[in-house]
């Protein structure tokens, strides 16, 4: 960023163009650069929440990708999701415009800061948001670049006034190992992004580098409830690691006396830090979001807060100020006294965690769990097909749509229908159904919803838009529901 800082002082401000600026990771970096005073623009195929937000700040957005979009730009930023055949990439190469990977731009933003990088297969976005809340409660105003919309801020990125930067570190293409972090958090490690890594051991090796690349004065925070993370922690001796968990009796930070409902979780915490005599107990910590997995996410934030001496009051206040993250067990509506939940879960482990939370709540309300799942990417379904067959046990009624391609080509034999067929054949679920059209979910809700039920609409595709339009869709059929968000 030093070169860019010099060029920013020139009378002619050079332009940074983002291809795919509507993506959650790209939009966050674009917003930070804009707030730092750089001239930013970008393109995306369709308008969405992020493009509208950036436009409201005065950032120029092109809908569609075309060579003329980069006529007067000095730098082009891309993510690994952008096809190399994109016309703007081809034009940038032709004109020798520097092309910068998203992760490299993030690294430049982090290089001169004291940085917290949050990675792991699941829970990154919520953990990043929780860490940010604790920093703010401690009187530190961090810059934050997140992978989801933070409800407190109605954005996924914002510029702070302190020397701290908190960022979600995407592990999908191994670029996260090059991020210059001071503190590294690993929430869990599961088989994911194997289309890039090819095998699980290579993915685990990337997480090892994520820790060992820390400076000697930094530290890692790791969840040892997860057996792969525990083994990784046991194998690393050259960096300080603070561990946390619920089931791990030897973890440095442990949650116990846990109680959760539809809106919150309350628990106590035992802290036994390495090289520190004695044990500290923090009683009755409350986070305004349900689920065991979110308690684990909060323990990661507590570990950072304890290591940086935030104090118990700041930790509790920070959690009290947390308002959740968009699409993380978000209640969007009520129909016939049933709660309709929008959730980003798209990996088998995420699905299990989300449905376990829903089951716990439904049992307390004498209700049932109705899961409507939209698979995301043919490659993910192919690599994890057996895991997908086993992850819906906590759903009383299950509906699976066809696969949201996300730009991928179909793979023979890998469909939503084939998943339902295998689940039924192997008796993993006795009420698994295929939804040929997502719009058919309206009928599912009308026919099945009852008082106390939890209707969970899950996936990383367009099922979220569907969930947030349920009031209109129900009204078109002569029914009405209460919209929550």
Swiss-Prot record:
Pathway: Cell wall biogenesis; peptidoglycan biosynthesis. The keyword Nucleus does not apply. GO terms for cellular component: cytoplasm. Keywords: ATP-binding, Cell cycle, Cell division, Cell shape, Cell wall biogenesis/degradation, Cytoplasm, Ligase, Nucleotide-binding, Peptidoglycan synthesis. Transmembrane segments: none annotated. InterPro entries: Mur-like_cat_sf, Mur_ligase_C, Mur_ligase_C_dom_sf, Mur_ligase_cen, Mur_ligase_N, MurCDEF_pg_biosynth, UDP-N-AcMur_Ala_ligase_MurC. Its EC number is 6.3.2.8. Its main location: cytoplasm. This is UDP-N-acetylmuramate--L-alanine ligase. It comes from Rickettsia massiliae (strain Mtu5).
């Amino acid at each position: 960023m030093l070169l860019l800082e010099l060029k920013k002082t020139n009378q002619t401000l050079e332009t940074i163009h983002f291809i795919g600026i509507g993506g959650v990771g790209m939009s966050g970096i674009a917003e930070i650069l804009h707030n730092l005073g750089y001239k930013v623009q970008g393109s995306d195929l369709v308008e969405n929440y992020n493009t509208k937000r950036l436009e409201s700040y005065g950032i120029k957005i092109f809908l569609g990708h075309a060579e003329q979009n980069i006529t007067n730009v000095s730098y082009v930023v891309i993510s690994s999701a952008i096809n190399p055949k994109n016309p703007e990439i081809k034009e940038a190469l032709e004109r020798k415009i520097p092309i910068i990977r998203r992760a490299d731009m993030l690294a430049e933003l982090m290089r001169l800061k004291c940085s917290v990088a949050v990675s792991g297969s699941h829970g990154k976005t919520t953990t990043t948001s929780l860490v940010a809340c604790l920093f703010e409660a401690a009187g530190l105003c961090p810059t934050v670049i997140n992978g989801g919309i933070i409800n407190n801020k109605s954005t996924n990125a914002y510029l702070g006034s302190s020397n701290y930067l908190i960022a979600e570190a995407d592990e999908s293409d191994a670029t996260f190992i090059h991020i210059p972090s001071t503190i590294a958090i690993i929430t869990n490690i599961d088989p994911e992004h194997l289309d890039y890594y090819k095998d699980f051991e290579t993915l685990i090796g990337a997480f090892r580098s994520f820790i060992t690349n820390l400076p000697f004065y930094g530290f890692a925070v790791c969840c040892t409830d997860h057996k792969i993370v525990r083994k990784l922690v046991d194998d690393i001796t050259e960096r300080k690691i603070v561990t946390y968990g619920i089931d791990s009796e030897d973890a440095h930070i442990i949650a116990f006396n846990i109680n959760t409902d539809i809106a919150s979780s309350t628990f106590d915490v035992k802290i036994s830090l390495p090289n520190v005599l004695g044990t500290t107990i923090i009683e009755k910590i409350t986070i305004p979001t349900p689920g065991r997995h979110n308690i684990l996410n909060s323990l990661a934030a507590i570990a950072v807060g304890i290591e940086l001496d935030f104090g118990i009051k700041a930790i509790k206040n920070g959690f009290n100020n947390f308002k959740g993250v968009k699409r993380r067990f978000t209640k969007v509506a009520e129909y016939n006294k049933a709660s309709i939940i929008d959730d980003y879960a798209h990996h088998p482990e995420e699905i299990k965690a989300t449905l376990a939370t829903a089951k716990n709540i439904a049992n307390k309300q004498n209700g049932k769990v109705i899961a409507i799942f939209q698979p995301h990417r043919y490659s993910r379904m192919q690599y994890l097909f057996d895991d997908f067959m086993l992850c819906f046990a906590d759903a009383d009624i299950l509906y699976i749509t066809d696969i949201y391609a996300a730009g991928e080509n179909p793979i023979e034999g890998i469909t939503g229908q084939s998943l339902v067929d295998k689940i039924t054949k192997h008796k993993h679920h006795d009420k698994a159904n295929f939804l040929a059209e997502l719009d058919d979910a309206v009928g599912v809700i009308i026919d099945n919803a009852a008082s106390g039920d939890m209707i969970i609409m899950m996936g990383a595709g367009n099922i979220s838009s569907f969930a947030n339009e349920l009031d209109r869709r129900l009204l078109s059929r002569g029914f009405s529901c209460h919209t929550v968000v």
